[in-house]
């Protein structure tokens, strides 16, 4: 299991660690309108899954904005930003940041995504900063769990993986 720190304190990741080549497991999260959304809702598309501890922090905000801007140039690709923030907070953030079309999804109900992808920080009940790219046929082609929660992911590597997927 990947070792992760949050604010330089070790945290325990819970769930099933995912690797390149794994079939991407389905999950159920909630969108800003409180509707259930699953990974399968985006079958046939490349899915760049950007995972943030809380959308309303500087690194998480930058991560969400950067992936949405970069991926807008990619064909057949959708960016899904997932956190445990309440859908209301995600909606407010998108409006304030001028990103009304960003897809923000909340895993607050039962941590379905976090469990399926092994990124629940047990001590904090937050998701570890991470990125997964799932190709159009449902195979994980890129994973990154950022070792320190306050650091940025490798944006270039994730976008390149999405381009090749």
Curated annotation (Swiss-Prot):
Cysteines joined through disulfide linkages: 60-94
Keyword presence, Aminoacyl-tRNA synthetase: no
Give the first-level EC class, as a single word.
oxidoreductase
Catalysed transformations (reactions): a hydroperoxide + [thioredoxin]-dithiol = an alcohol + [thioredoxin]-disulfide + H2O
| Enzyme Commission number(s) of this protein | 1.11.1.24
Keyword Metal-binding annotated: no
Thioredoxin domain: from which residue to which, for each copy?
18-164
List the Gene3D superfamilies hit by this protein, alphabetically.
Glutaredoxin
Q: Spell out the InterPro entries in the cross-references.
A: Redoxin, Thioredoxin-like_sf, Thioredoxin_domain, TPX, Tpx_CS, Tpx_Peroxidase_subfamily
Remaining remarks:
The active site is a conserved redox-active cysteine residue, the peroxidatic cysteine (C(P)), which makes the nucleophilic attack on the peroxide substrate. The peroxide oxidizes the C(P)-SH to cysteine sulfenic acid (C(P)-SOH), which then reacts with another cysteine residue, the resolving cysteine (C(R)), to form a disulfide bridge. The disulfide is subsequently reduced by an appropriate electron donor to complete the catalytic cycle. In this atypical 2-Cys peroxiredoxin, C(R) is present in the same subunit to form an intramolecular disulfide.
Spell out the subunit comment. Answer: Homodimer.
Give the protein's biological function.
Thiol-specific peroxidase that catalyzes the reduction of hydrogen peroxide and organic hydroperoxides to water and alcohols, respectively. Plays a role in cell protection against oxidative stress by detoxifying peroxides.
Would you identify the family this protein belongs to, as annotated?
A: Belongs to the peroxiredoxin family. Tpx subfamily.
What is the protein name for this chain? Thiol peroxidase
- Source taxonomy: Bacteria, Bacillati, Bacillota, Bacilli, Bacillales
